Regions:
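Hydrophobic alpha-helical topogenic segments used for membrane insertion/localization
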Residues: 48-59
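Repetitive helical segments and hydrophobic/amphipathic motifs
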Residues: 13-15, 19-21, 26-29, 35
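Intrinsic low-complexity, disordered N-terminal segments enriched in polar/charged/small residues
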Residues: 2-4, 9-10
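Iron-sulfur-cluster electron-transfer modules
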Residues: 72-97, 101, 108, 115-125, ...
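Cofactor-cradling patches in redox/metallo enzymes
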Residues: 200, 272-363, 412-424, 435-545
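Catalytic cores of enzyme domains
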Residues: 358-415, 428-431, 443-449
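Membrane-penetrating hydrophobic segments
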Residues: 41-46
Length: 545
């Protein structure tokens, strides 16, 4: 939402500032840009301004048309934002989608031929041209010669059928076109294939939708290990067996029992960090306390594994449960470690909860803590005494000569984590040389862990993670810095089995900022040994019976 808060629509000045922040600078825009098109304005003044900017003439004529037609802010804002982005060239930094049939019908009800024409023109601009650019960028598509547009067209044909006919239709289609099934099962949802799509197709959204159809059609057998809405899954079992818990930290599920105002922030480490890096998780908690936040913590998963398995309804219910816990505790801020977690939650609650990437919070609050400590700044805004700034900001950074930052697939369009991590490195670790990969930011590669692909075709995961490692080696950097803890896990796992010359020192950004390392050798040893130890029979009965 360009107007990130309802109050931002109360006067033109705030409206203009909000639009500029979201559309032009993108410095503090929400996670999912598709939401920014969903309701770019929340009242008629904002809508008037956007329509005027979009078409490059005085806002009043078009604004009067929109405001007099009863079109919802959802459809109107979506259309205006789409046209605005096309006009100004901001589309490439924005996640967009076409208006749905229902939204087009709503616009048609406004009885405005011009508005109907513009909405269909905007949709046409996002129609796949089958240029095969995505095919050439992805081995999963290249081998069978598919493109994302063909996959979407097949999906649309299935979805046009009555719901009770879809499972049989999907089974028949995949039986006759196994190459398509194989490609869809090997998709990591990374979005690399459509990062430069000329018509703004978004592969992850469409590819993931097929998983739900596969589940409904009996073509996909989920693993109980990753059913994170159950009491027992791989992460909760690991924590229970090895005694990993946080009794000293108030859990989100219990936060509502405390006095109102006790908590304003929920820390969401994500399933990997909270399970495999308890000391680092606690260190982040100490920083949150020192930084003045009243926080509790959730040890839940964001539900991404459920989405990969095709359980969309279960994933939505799981996230809704977490959202209800947040609202019950009166919390207004969620701090996420992983870009993927932030993205999963944003569509549900970005209008109500401020979802902030942890590195962005560290950078912003660190500056405030510097000011409070009286740290002097240079003319460029950087601290004169870096050591004093580091102490004031509550960090304890590692000493490494050079790094290369591996941007997350989930940060591809948003870029908030990547900008903030690089910002922290430059501000508090200026002695560290940042050597950028050729494939970075929007063009970042995939580690191969997404979409639960490793369980179906581990070769894809291995090829992709080694591509990242090779790219990192080519920069000459000493250390590869990851954003997603799952990326950290995947690269660490590959390091354990790779030839010595291909091993690279790799750490999550939090390990660098707080000077603590995750002992992955111990983690992987425990993950293997727990199946043959005293808990082995229980694990096998729980997950494979």
């Amino acid at each position: 939402t360009a107007c990130n808060r309802q109050a931002a629509c109360e006067n033109d000045c705030l409206v203009r500032e909000s639009i500029h922040d979201c559309m032009v600078s993108n410095s503090r825009a929400p996670y999912r840009r598709v939401i920014s098109l969903r309701a770019i304005m929340r009242d008629k003044k904002a809508l008037a301004f956007a329509s005027g900017v979009a078409f490059g003439f005085a806002s009043y004529p078009f604004a009067r048309l929109l405001c007099s037609r009863g079109v919802s802010s959802y459809a109107s804002g979506f259309l205006c934002a789409t046209l605005f982005l096309m006009k100004t060239g901001q589309f490439k930094q924005t996640r967009v989608r076409k208006l749905t049939a229902d939204e087009l019908a709503e616009i048609d009800q406004a009885a405005s031929p011009a508005l109907s024409m513009l909405s269909r023109w905007a949709n046409k601009k996002m129609q796949c041209a089958h240029c095969k650019r995505c095919t050439l960028r992805c081995e999963v598509l290249k081998e069978p010669g598919l493109d994302v547009g063909t996959i979407q067209e097949a999906y649309d044909r299935v979805m046009s059928l009555p719901a009770d006919e879809r499972p049989a239709a999907v089974a028949e289609l995949m039986q006759s076109n196994y190459d398509m099934y194989h490609a869809l099962r090997r998709c990591c949802f990374c979005g690399y294939c459509t990062a430069d799509c000329a018509v703004h197709m978004l592969a992850p959204d469409r590819m993931r939708d097929w998983r739900e159809l596969f589940m409904q059609s009996g073509l996909y057998q989920p693993e109980k290990l990753t059913m994170v809405d159950n009491e027992w899954h791989i992460f909760s079992a690991y924590r229970a067996i090895f005694g990993i818990g946080y009794p000293e930290i108030v859990a989100l599920r219990d936060a509502a029992a405390y006095e109102p105002g006790t908590f304003d922030t929920v820390f969401f480490p994500g399933c990997s960090l909270v399970s495999y890096a308890p000391d680092l998780t606690r260190r982040v908690g100490e920083w949150l306390t020192a930084a003045g936040f009243k926080w509790c913590m959730s040890d839940d998963c964001c539900g991404s594994p459920l989405m990969s398995a095709g359980f969309f309804d279960r994933a939505a219910a799981h996230r809704e449960k977490i959202f209800e816990q947040i609202k019950a505790a009166g919390i207004t801020r969620m701090v996420t470690v992983c870009p993927g977690c932030g993205e999963e939650f944003a569509e549900l609650m970005a209008d109500d909860i401020d979802i902030i990437p942890l590195p962005e919070l560290i950078l912003e609050r660190g500056r405030e803590m510097e000011r409070a400590a009286g740290v002097a700044l240079r003319a460029d805004g950087m601290p004169e005494d870096v050591d004093a700034a580091v102490r004031a900001a509550g960090l304890s950074p590692s000493n490494v000569p050079s790094v290369t930052v591996f941007d997350s697939c989930h940060d591809r369009h948003d870029g908030r984590h990547g900008r903030a991590i690089r910002g922290v490195l430059r501000r508090y670790m200026p002695q560290v040389e940042i050597r950028e990969m050729d494939e970075r930011r929007k063009q970042t590669l995939c580690c191969g862990a997404g979409g639960a692909v490793a369980g179906y075709d581990p070769d894809i995961t291995k090829r992709r993670v080694m591509r990242v490692v090779d790219e990192a080696h080519s920069t000459g950097a000493n250390t590869l810095v990851t954003m997603c803890p799952t990326c950290t896990y995947t690269i660490a796992q590959e390091n354990l089995s790779a030839a010595p010359e291909r091993v690279i020192d790799s750490h999550n950004y939090l390990e660098l900022f707080f000077g603590q390392t995750i002992d992955w050798a111990v983690v992987f040893d425990q993950l293997g040994s727990m199946w043959t130890g005293e808990y082995g029979p229980w694990l096998n009965a729980t997950f494979f019976s």
